[in-house]
Amino acid sequence: SGVGDGVDVVSAIEGAAGPIAAIGGAVLTVMVGIKVYKWVRRAM
């Protein structure tokens, strides 16, 4: 057990990190886009 279990957990986290990072990045991009859009609309 010991070492093998640790490796499985790490590989599972690394496997999940990609999609989570992609979703997080998309959400962040949308939020920034909305802020910029509102700011530009108010400036015009």
Curated annotation (Swiss-Prot):
State where it is primarily located. Answer: virion
Which residues are recorded with the post-translational modification N-acetylserine?
Answer: 1
Instruction: Give residue spans on the Periplasmic membrane side.
Output: 1-19
Task: Enumerate the subcellular locations listed in this protein's record, separating them with semicolons.
Answer: Virion; Host membrane
GO cellular component terms attached to this protein's record? helical viral capsid; host cell membrane; membrane
Membrane-spanning parts: 20-37
Q: How does it sit in the membrane?
A: Single-pass membrane protein
Output the Pfam families linked to this UniProt entry.
Phage_Coat_B
Which ranges make up the Cytoplasmic topological domains here? 38-44
Signal peptide start and end residues: none
Keywords of the record, alphabetical order, are: Acetylation, Capsid protein, Helical capsid protein, Host membrane, Membrane, Transmembrane, Transmembrane helix, Virion
- What function does the entry list? Self assembles to form a helical capsid wrapping up the viral genomic DNA. The capsid displays a filamentous structure with a length of 760-1950 nm and a width of 6-8 nm. The virion assembly and budding take place at the host inner membrane.
**Family under the similarity heading:** Belongs to the inovirus capsid protein family.
Q: How does the annotation summarize its subunit structure?
A: Homomultimerizes. There are several thousands of this protein in the phage capsid.
Q: What is this protein called?
A: Capsid protein G8P
Q: Give the originating organism.
A: Xanthomonas phage Xf
**Which gene name does the record give?**
VIII
